[in-house]
Amino acid sequence: MSRTYDDSMFIDTFEHEYTWLNGFMRNVRRFSAKNAIIDPETNRSWTYGSMNKEVNRFAHALQKDGVKKDDIVMAALRNSPAFAMSYVAPRKIGAILLAANFNLASGEMALLIDHNKPKIIIYSANIKNVILEAEKKCSHKPERCILADNIENEAIPEGHVSYEDYIEGMSEDEPQINFRPHIYDEVLRLCTSGTTALPKSVPLNDINEVLSAHDVIMHYPLNPNDACLNMTPWFHRGGCHCGGPCPSFYVGCAVVVMRAFQPKNTLDWVSKYSITFLMGAPANLEMLSRAQERTPKDLSSL
């Protein structure tokens, strides 16, 4: 198709530079001292600067384990800081995050492992036994299993490693890569719960992520001064992309972590953290409404 100008430079720049990760890194530069993650249950928070440093440590650890472009990193994680780090770290080195439903039974988890053949599995401490059973059932054996978000103080299974030990001593510098990113690179696989059949994976490429972020940013609208709490699991489309990690880290606002929905905590956190957007299913909102009627909280920030 002929143009009235030479579009080759624009096409090259758009296809290789207009990535979700570049948007995130823009926020690291602009808002390095601004909160990116707030975890009320552990009383911890990460700024965009400190988050990026931890993401880089995770990415370097993955590289040390031989993870490279198009390899799969499987995350069976509840909403947690570890999920946020897992959302960004693999794409820094060209790997694909498989966001698995942590509620799956061990047989279904084994099916996902055999189908996707992840090189690394990172999982929440509360599903340790499910992962151990899945390991026994699946044919594919990951090279590393990482126990993360260990608020239960679970013992580390033999042959596994804690997330903290895994990233210990790793460089905070940007990881080196030997490829040029492209907007059509697969960066994320979302897994259905298997409601109508066996669990399946849905591939999302980088431009899917960028356009999903833009859609939410424009529709809400979101800005860097917002604080978002998605009350649903981040492993699915609604949790990840509706005020979850995807648009929030792209626009530069804060994400408040909620591992399991609790109406009272939700209302308390709105006031405490000046939350501007709450996302959830109708059932969540109905429960919030009842709790607010019983014990009114200051929701003026919403």
Where are the predicted features?
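Conserved AMP-binding/adenylation subdomain of ANL enzymes
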Residues: 210-227, 235-277, 283-295
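Conserved AMP-binding A3 loop
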Residues: 45-49, 178-180, 187-211
